Structure formats: C-alpha cells, structure tokens
C-alpha cells in the first residue's frame, strides 16, 4: 500500500462561472482518460471524491513520488486559477493507537 493523501480543493473568490465551468470540463476529460484528476497514467490511485459547498476532498494513494509530482504540477497548471489545492499525508490513527486504546480499558 502506498502513502494515502487527502487532497483539498477550495474554489477561489471572484472566479467567473465560465472559468470554473471550463476547468471542470478539463477535469472531467482528464478523469475519463486517466482515472484521476491529475492526468497521470500510473503511480497515483484515485479512491474517492467528495463534494462540498466550498469545493471538495479527494482521497488518493501515491505509489510513485515522481508521478505525484506530475499530479501536483498538473493541478497547479490546469486548475490553479480557479481553486486552491492542498495535499495532506494521512496515517491510520486507529492502527497507530490500537494498543494504547486497548490498554486504557
């Protein structure tokens, strides 16, 4: 299993609807072609996208750091004018603290 990341995208203020629609159109084409929002053929696996009123969250798994670099650059180049994107590495807190919780009984 690779490193899991939570990707957050938030719509920028004062973005025109036409710009946002154009970015989404490109995003849908990218996803249809590669199975992820970052346009990489392998090395980044998309698990789920969640929408919110301010943008959304994407759960991805990274197996190849170079592919992740391309994934990030694609976002900055293609969507950066309409959304602010951040990536946070995740760890399994349930597994990490399982013994501590068990010993707290």
Segments predicted by a language model, with ranges:
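Short S/T/G/P-rich N-terminal loop/turn motif that feeds into the first structured element of a domain
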Residues: 1-55, 62-71, 90-105
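Short, structurally constrained coil/turn elements
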Residues: 36-38, 78-81
